[in-house]
């Protein structure tokens, strides 16, 4: 049975890891053993934060809607309750966009909500 030499496959594997570690600081970018650990940890952070991103953005939208609705004299919780009651089917992402980029449209929604709650 012939001897198997792993030079080509090892080189390819090392190259793949070192390319993923591009931009890292210190020896994490050019020492395979350290780069491999750094890439693994980066992957764990990426996996975790893809899930956290959804929470973070929802919190941001809620903060923006709350600020805009309070400037119109209504709290966030009453505003959301009024939207549900008025059967306005618009999500928090779009409400936050309106609050930031089109305050007049957001104001008209607030007026409809206030009328529904009164």
Curated annotation (Swiss-Prot):
CDD domains: Ribosomal_L20. Keywords: Ribonucleoprotein, Ribosomal protein, RNA-binding, rRNA-binding. It comes from the Bacteria. It holds the Pfam family Ribosomal_L20. PROSITE patterns: RIBOSOMAL_L20 (PS00937). One of its GO terms (biological process) is ribosomal large subunit assembly. The keyword RNA-binding applies. GO terms for molecular function: rRNA binding; structural constituent of ribosome. One of its GO terms (cellular component) is ribonucleoprotein complex. InterPro entries: Ribosomal_bL20, RIBOSOMAL_L20_CS, Ribosomal_protein_bL20_C. HAMAP family: Ribosomal_bL20. Belongs to the bacterial ribosomal protein bL20 family. Binds directly to 23S ribosomal RNA and is necessary for the in vitro assembly process of the 50S ribosomal subunit. It is not involved in the protein synthesizing functions of that subunit. This is Large ribosomal subunit protein bL20. It comes from Methylibium petroleiphilum (strain ATCC BAA-1232 / LMG 22953 / PM1). The gene is rplT.
């Amino acid at each position: 049975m012939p001897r198997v030499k792993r030079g080509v496959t090892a080189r390819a594997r090392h190259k793949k890891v070192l390319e993923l570690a591009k931009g890292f600081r210190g020896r994490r970018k050019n020492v395979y053993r350290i780069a491999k650990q750094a890439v693994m940890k980066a992957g764990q952070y990426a996996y975790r934060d893809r899930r956290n991103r959804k929470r973070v953005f929802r919190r941001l939208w809620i903060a923006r809607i709350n600020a805009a609705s309070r400037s119109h004299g209504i709290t966030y919780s009453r505003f959301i309750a009024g939207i549900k009651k008025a059967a306005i089917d618009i999500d928090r992402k779009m409400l936050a966009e309106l609050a930031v980029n089109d305050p007049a449209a957001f104001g008209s929604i607030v007026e409809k909500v206030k009328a529904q709650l009164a």
